[in-house]
């Protein structure tokens, strides 16, 4: 399946919640009818079956992190192999992706923009260029903007936007240096309460 390139707000309307696919300059409910699905019959809200609810939750999380279906399934398999709670393991793996860490540190306004920065070799990890968005960042890794990319206006603008967002406690960022440290693995309480990972586990456990 190809990566979705259509209107980002349509995806948020489909899931009925802000997926943080836009820059966050304005609240998403001022841009669109978030409670109404796209399409002619979007105002109708059919009652979902258990399977439907599980599928919608999986799609929502997959779209938040910009993951393709096959990738997402592989993350679930890895989460299931690890010790502990499978659902929480899944979220931790997704949060540890380099493109997500770049976004969380404020170097990009969206995860899609962060993915582009990584792919274009604008990001270094422990002093080495890494251009793989799915690269797993480890505790104490230093993630920074490459020296020759620090003049990019969009990175500076993103750092200004990041000042308006809640700062992740598991990261330590020096905005002036455009670098940060992955201090610890995030706990479930650190992450969005709007995600019900248990539904995803139920879906894949069938």
Curated annotation (Swiss-Prot):
Q: Name one GO biological process term.
A: translation
Residues forming the S4 RNA-binding domain are: 96-156
| Any one of the GO CC terms | small ribosomal subunit
Q: Which HAMAP family match?
A: Ribosomal_uS4_B
Give the record's family classification: Belongs to the universal ribosomal protein uS4 family.
Q: Which GO terms describe its molecular function?
A: rRNA binding; structural constituent of ribosome
Protein origin, superkingdom: Bacteria
Function, as annotated, reads:
One of the primary rRNA binding proteins, it binds directly to 16S rRNA where it nucleates assembly of the body of the 30S subunit. With S5 and S12 plays an important role in translational accuracy.
| Key word Methyltransferase present | no
Q: How does it assemble?
A: Part of the 30S ribosomal subunit. Contacts protein S5. The interaction surface between S4 and S5 is involved in control of translational fidelity.
Q: Which gene encodes it?
A: rpsD
Q: What is this protein called?
A: Small ribosomal subunit protein uS4
Alphabetic keyword roster: Ribonucleoprotein, Ribosomal protein, RNA-binding, rRNA-binding
Q: What's a Pfam family this protein contains? A: Ribosomal_S4
Cite the InterPro entries for this sequence.
Ribosomal_uS4, Ribosomal_uS4_bac-type, Ribosomal_uS4_CS, Ribosomal_uS4_N, S4_RNA-bd, S4_RNA-bd_sf
Q: Does the keyword Ribonucleoprotein apply?
A: yes
């Amino acid at each position: 399946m190809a990566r979705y390139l259509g209107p980002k707000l349509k995806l948020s309307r489909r899931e009925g919640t802000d997926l943080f696919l836009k820059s966050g300059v304005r609240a998403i409910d001022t841009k669109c009818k978030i409670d109404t699905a796209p399409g002619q019959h979007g105002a109708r809200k059919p009652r979902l079956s258990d399977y439907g609810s599980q599928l919608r939750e999986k799609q929502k999380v997959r779209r938040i992190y910009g993951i393709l279906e096959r990738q997402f399934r592989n993350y679930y398999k890895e989460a299931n192999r690890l010790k502990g709670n499978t659902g929480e393991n899944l979220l931790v793996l997704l949060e540890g992706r380099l493109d997500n860490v770049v976004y969380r540190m404020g170097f990009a306004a969206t995860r899609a923009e962060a993915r582009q920065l990584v792919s274009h070799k604008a990001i270094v990890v422990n002093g080495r260029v890494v251009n793989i968005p799915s690269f797993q960042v480890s505790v104490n890794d230093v993630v920074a903007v490459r020296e020759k990319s620090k003049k990019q206006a969009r990175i500076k603008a993103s750092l200004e936007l990041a000042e308006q967002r809640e700062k992740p406690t598991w990261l330590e960022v020096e905005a002036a240096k455009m670098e940060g440290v992955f201090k610890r693995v995030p706990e479930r309480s650190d992450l969005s309460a709007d995600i019900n990972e248990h539904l995803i586990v139920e879906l894949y456990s069938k």
